[in-house]
C-alpha cells in the first residue's frame, strides 16, 4: 500500500480543474485554451514524476496501490494501482491529450465546454487504465462515453449528430454485455461478491460459464477496439469529428478495447481465451486484409485514415491471440505505436483541412508546393504507418510475426497461412497510404484554382508534429524502452497458459 495517493490525484485532478473552468467568469477563449494546456502539462509531469520515483520495472505485481472503502452499502471500493500493462497506456494518454488540447486551438465556438470535456475524458481514461476493481473499471468505461458523445455531436462536420448517435448506440449497447460480465464474475462462487481484480485472477470457473463471460467481455471490447464486423461506427465518427477529438479517439479510445481484452479476457479467463484464440487470429488476419482493401475506396481523407487504424488493430488482435511472449509484447508495442501514428495522421489531415476546406481526396491535388512542411510531415508519418524500418510500427509488426512463428499452439501450415495473408495486407497498406499522399500533394488540381494561396504550418503545428514524430522514431530505434515496462507482467499473464 502506498502512503501518498498518487493515482487518486492523477485521476481526479483533470476533471476537478476542468470543472473549475466552468464556474469561473468568462475571460475569453485564449484564457480557457492556455488554462487547459497548463492543466494537461501539469498532469503529464505529475504522472511522469510519480511513475519515475515509485514504479519498479522488475516487479510484475500491482504498484502504487490504493484501496479505500467507497460505498458501504454496496461494499464498493475505490481500488487503483498500476503494473507494466497499464503504465504505458497511462503515459500515452497524458502525452496525446496534452497535444490534442494544443491542437484544439482553432476551436472558438463554446470553447470552455469543449476544453472541459477534453479534461473529463482525460480523467475517465486514466481512471480506466489504473482501476483495480471491476465495477470501477465499468464505471470509468461508461463515464468516458459522455464527454466523447458531446465532443462528437457538438463540434465537427455536417453529419456529426448522425455519427455521434451511431457511436453511442454501438458503445452503450455493447456496455450491457460488459455489465452482465462484471456482475456474472463478481457473483459467482463466493458467499460475498468480490470485484477485486487481483482476487479474481486466481479464481476458476466452470467451462460453460467462462465461455459465456468471455463472449460478453469480447463483444464489449470488440466494439471499442474495433473488431470487424463491429467497426462501422469508426469511419463515420472519424469522418465527422473535429481533428483534436480524432486524435483522442485514434490515440487512446481504441486502445481501451485492446487493454480490456488483455486485462480481463486474457488475465481472468485463461481457459476460454485459449479456446477462442484461434478465432482471434483468423479475425485479426481478415481484418488486416479487409480494412486495407476497403481503404482505397474511401473518398473522404479522414475515413481512409480510419480504415488504416482498423487494419493496424488487426495486428493487436493477432498478437493477443498468439498467446506467446513476443506476440503479446508486440501487441502492447503496437498499442503504443499506433497511438502516436494514428493521432499524428489525423492531426495533419485536420491542419490541411483548415487551410483548403476540402475533405475529399478527389478534390485535392498539388498541395505540396504551397505547404511543404505539412507535406514533409505527412509523408514521414505515412511511412511510419506503413511500418517503415526505423519507425515504431515496423518493430511492433515484426515482433507480432515472431509471436506467430514461435507459438506452440498452432500447426505449421496454419502459421504459414496466417503469415501469408498478413503479408498481403502489409503489401496493400503502402498502396492506399501512398495513393492518398499522391492524391493530396501531387498533380496540379488546386494550383489551377483562382486565388489559390494558403499558409504553411505555423510554429504550433510544427512543434506538435515533431513532438509526436520523436517518440515514433525513438521507439523504432530503441523498442526495449517500452518492452521492458511490460515484459514481467506479460510473463506473469502467460504463466496461466500451458504452452508458449
Swiss-Prot record:
Subcellular locations according to the entry: Plastid, Chloroplast thylakoid membrane
- The source's domain of life comes to Eukaryota
* Name under which the protein is recorded: NAD(P)H-quinone oxidoreductase chain 4, chloroplastic
What HAMAP family is this protein classified in? NDH1_NuoM
Annotated Gene Ontology cellular components are: chloroplast thylakoid membrane
So what does this thing catalyse?
a plastoquinone + NADH + (n+1) H(+)(in) = a plastoquinol + NAD(+) + n H(+)(out); a plastoquinone + NADPH + (n+1) H(+)(in) = a plastoquinol + NADP(+) + n H(+)(out)
UniProt entry tagged with the keyword Cell membrane:
no
Record bears the keyword Plastid: yes
- Keyword terms, alphabetized: Chloroplast, Membrane, NAD, NADP, Plastid, Plastoquinone, Quinone, Thylakoid, Translocase, Transmembrane, Transmembrane helix
Q: Where are the transmembrane segments?
A: 4-24, 35-55, 87-107, 113-130, 134-154, 167-187, 211-231, 242-262, 272-292, 305-325, 330-350, 386-406, 416-436, 462-482
> PANTHER family from the entry?
NAD(P)H-QUINONE OXIDOREDUCTASE CHAIN 4, CHLOROPLASTIC, NADH-UBIQUINONE OXIDOREDUCTASE CHAIN 4
Q: According to the UniProt record, what class of enzyme is this?
A: translocase
Q: What is its main location?
A: plastid
For the biological process aspect of GO, one term held by this record is: ATP synthesis coupled electron transport
